[in-house]
Amino acid sequence: MQQDISETDDLNLPSKLILNNKEFQSGTKIVRKHGCGSIVGTLSGPHRKVLFYLYQNKGQVVSKQILKRVGWAGKAVTCASVLVAIYEIRRVLDCRCIQTISNEGYVMAD
């Protein structure tokens, strides 16, 4: 079940995530290859929050509105910001694990 998100929530997101042999850490935008540590790309803070939230809610459709509040809490952003975040996450992950559900949102495959 998805967490309720408000403008002031401090999300309980993991500090580290390994997906598709890539290592993401909440405290740095650098993405490393798992095991050898070589840098494979970067992911901004809001984009990492979106990724970690989708991971925590694997198998569930998460709306763009929720992802806006997760990544950019308290800031006025459009759905285009979410679209860019999903694009960048997919590019860095180099996999098809995040699917678009038309008129609903996004889901990370189990």
What is the role of each PLM region?
Residues 38-71:
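Short amphipathic alpha-helical recognition elements used for nucleic-acid or partner binding
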Residues 59, 74, 103-105:
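Glycine-centered flexibility sites
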Residues 72-82:
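Short, positively charged loop/turn segments that connect secondary-structure elements
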